[in-house]
Swiss-Prot record:
This is Small ribosomal subunit protein uS5. The gene is rpsE. Residues 11-74 form the S5 DRBM domain. Belongs to the universal ribosomal protein uS5 family. SUPFAM superfamilies: dsRNA-binding domain-like, Ribosomal protein S5 domain 2-like. Pfam families: Ribosomal_S5, Ribosomal_S5_C. It comes from Carboxydothermus hydrogenoformans (strain ATCC BAA-161 / DSM 6008 / Z-2901).
């Protein structure tokens, strides 16, 4: 799959989680920060990145750079996703279900941020297993990567979309 050029898109970013870690040294503790950041254009492109640095702003900046390198294209049908799917990352599992227009984004913090940045307006989600923000974010991205529209499936099978829907 070709890498998506972030410079061509109008991306906005959102910090999902900031974590402080401590390294104990002879003179006390050394603190370091990690930031989990999501970037997206609300038109079907989204990416998640992790940045680590001694200061929070630097960690966020690195997270944004990393997220721009990991952009994916999300197939959106009307305002929702094409079909139900489960994404897994580590012990984190997330169930994504298409929803009727007007439902809104029913999701927890990390999953909600990613779906809103991707441009999904109506969706039902359920966190299964671990709810660690890192695993939830990566499980959501894995699920979104695996989505296929009827047209994509038809093309892969060499059939028309009508034949696929008919069964």
């Amino acid at each position: 799959m070709a890498r998506i050029d972030a410079s061509q898109l109008e991306l906005s970013e959102k910090v999902i989680a900031i974590n402080r870690t401590a390294k104990v040294v002879k003179g006390g503790r050394r603190f370091s920060f990690s930031a989990l950041v999501v970037v997206g254009d609300q038109k079907g492109h989204v990416g998640v990145g992790l940045g680590k640095a001694p200061e929070v702003p630097d960690a966020i900046r690195k997270g944004i750079e990393d997220a721009k390198k990991n952009l994916i294209k999300v197939p959106i049908v009307n305002t929702t996703i094409p079909h139900e799917i489960i994404g897994e990352a580590g012990a984190g599992k997330v169930l994504l279900k298409p929803a009727a227009p007007g439902t809104g984004v029913i999701a927890g913090s990390a999953v909600r941020a990613i779906l809103e940045m991707a441009g999904v307006r109506d969706i039902l989600t359920k966190s299964l297993g671990s709810n660690n923000p890192h695993n939830m974010a990566h499980a959501t991205i894995e699920a979104l990567k695996s989505l296929k529209t009827v047209e994509m499936v038809a093309k892969l099978r060499g059939k028309t979309p009508a034949e696929i829907l008919k069964g």
